[in-house]
Amino acid sequence: LGINVGALIGHSAVRLYVMGEDSQKREATDDEIKQMVEIVEMAMKHGALGVSSSYVDVDENFDPVPSRFSCIKEKMALAKAATITGRGVWQVVPYFIDMETQLKNIQELGDISLETGIMCTFQPVLSTPDAPKAERIMEALQKERDRGAKVFGQTMPRCFDLNMRLSETSMLLFGMPTWKSIM
């Protein structure tokens, strides 16, 4: 039995490499997007499976990670670059803290898929199977597939459990408006 591993290109890592500290301050310029596209194309030619990005993650200082500062133009360009080998996936962590924002993330993934032809996935779909939240997510996914987009949610085959320490960064705590100022 072999190891089942595939490498994804980190959107935040590519932004940080190209833009330095500005990657967590602003949108990329056209030249910076071009540089990022070249990196993604090179990685895909060397065996990467696609790009990973995030709508929700924060760094050790509770600041949004670089990918959260990207505009749709950048996302489209990198997703398109990830398809040059005939394969490619755009994998994201949605902003699962807020349902309406998460639904907008799903629609944006649909737009990216339709524009570039890439398959988009997001994980986690956090909910119980009978919860209204899960139903809304499934409806949003179906709506995107009805438009012709390749957008799929992923989840675990078991209950989601979370071990947290107040001394460490937690995306869930970031969703609480006063948490950053307290820490």
PLM feature spans:
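Catalytic pocket of metal/acid-base enzymes, prominently hydrolases
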Residues: 1-92
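Phosphate/oxyanion-binding active-site loops and adjacent basic polyanion-contact surfaces
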Residues: 71, 101-102
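Active-site-proximal beta-strand/loop segments in catalytic clefts of secreted hydrolases
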Residues: 54, 93-95, 123-125
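Polyanionic/metal-chelating signatures
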Residues: 1, 12-14, 22-31, 39, ...
